[in-house]
């Protein structure tokens, strides 16, 4: 058996290069040991010979690229070949796998319009009958109709451990025009012999492309059977009803307009919370990266269930598979309230901790309190390690990020007569804060005590205002006492007897010195107070 090796080859656009080997049993690749590749990335890649269908040779980003079309493993991209490798590579593929190496040239016109070809393993965008670029279906996470003639295609994102950098996350195709879609076949009326013509319905070309891409890329379904499925689940965000299919490593949300695929490693937290209305239960899923509908992002999925709704189901796995993989995580069959069953399935398949209410209880013995965030009304849940506001927008505030919490209440004339209060949560290291308003006054003491138990810094503006007012009043009283002491006997004028020597009617020395009329006698003054004499009548 003769093997042929090629050095410094990159597999599926990986940053690490390695060695590619062709043998009669198949094709293999292994990362180079000297390339600082981590142990997790050093696992060899093996492609059996029976999987290989076709191969193409074209220019790549690191030289020349070999694209291998497979039966069940998508498209395999191997980049980094030299132009001299073409003849040897073609000979080896033909000798070992009876596969012809086809030479393809890419279009370099730079046009942004062309034709799409939905091939077996990838979407090919062609310009002037030459491939302009290819998108493997395995790289497509979601696709949605964002308009009558527009289709958005979202791509998988690299893992959280990869270096931060620029990355294409979405591409949109504008597809004008309509196509005829047959809806009703021709029917002959036996009574009068008339033939009813078949009815046709026009459908947009964008819709046809979207449906075909969804089928090709398996966006609406996953190879294999779902482990468990839930139908017609009400979502508060994003709004609508979705069917949920849960697979070993991912789940599907299928709605009337949007379909989503969510990997379990995207799920960060799961909250199971009873609604304070005592009629519903909420299941909140935090995901990163978030779901997207156009420009709108949804980092939280909020499901609502009737509290008394029940479901009965069995896992769609064999007894052997259940014992090997799921025995310690799931039950073989369920017959209980729907929210309990779904919470247990999410916890078991994602292997994430299920967050439930802690020790906090409102005055109505509920784990949440009614309040408002800006113009939105909802419920605030003080949990063991965080605050969570639902439903729209859903806000997650871990205690570790809280700098301080300010309680404020405003009434007329500076006196607190309001029936509600506001709670402002300031975050560490930023000026960002969340203001929760319209909280019932009776809940304030309970929330304060709970926050103090969690070691959070509390500021009560009402208590501060009362303390400042009391301090100001004490200072005013002290000032009055000091003023009485400084005035001495002057403060006792009311208790002293009248001054016998004082004659209010006599002229003072000051008047004699400065008033030229000071010598006027009392008699003259008394005369001046009398009425003036009447005028004598004129002589006629």
Curated annotation (Swiss-Prot):
Q: Where are the transmembrane segments?
A: none
Question: What's the chief localization of this chain?
Answer: nucleus
Please note every region of biased composition (Acidic residues). 476-502
Q: Which UniProt keywords apply?
A: Chromosome, DNA damage, DNA repair, DNA replication, Nucleus, Transcription, Transcription regulation
A GO BP term, please? Answer: positive regulation of RNA polymerase II transcription preinitiation complex assembly
Q: Which domain of life is it from?
A: Eukaryota
Annotated GO MF terms: DNA binding; histone binding; nucleosome binding
Instruction: Give the residue ranges for region: Disordered.
Output: 475-540
Q: Where in the cell is it found?
A: Nucleus; Chromosome
An annotated GO cellular component: FACT complex
Role played: Component of the FACT complex, a general chromatin factor that acts to reorganize nucleosomes. The FACT complex is involved in multiple processes that require DNA as a template such as mRNA elongation, DNA replication and DNA repair. During transcription elongation the FACT complex acts as a histone chaperone that both destabilizes and restores nucleosomal structure.
The family annotation for this protein states: Belongs to the SSRP1 family.
What additional remark is attached to this entry? In contrast to the orthologous protein in animals and plants, this protein does not contain a HMG box DNA-binding domain. This function may instead be provided by the HMG box of the associated NHP6 protein in the FACT complex of fungi.
Oligomer status and interactors: Forms a stable heterodimer with SPT16. The SPT16-POB3 dimer weakly associates with multiple molecules of NHP6 to form the FACT complex.
Q: What is this protein called?
A: FACT complex subunit POB3
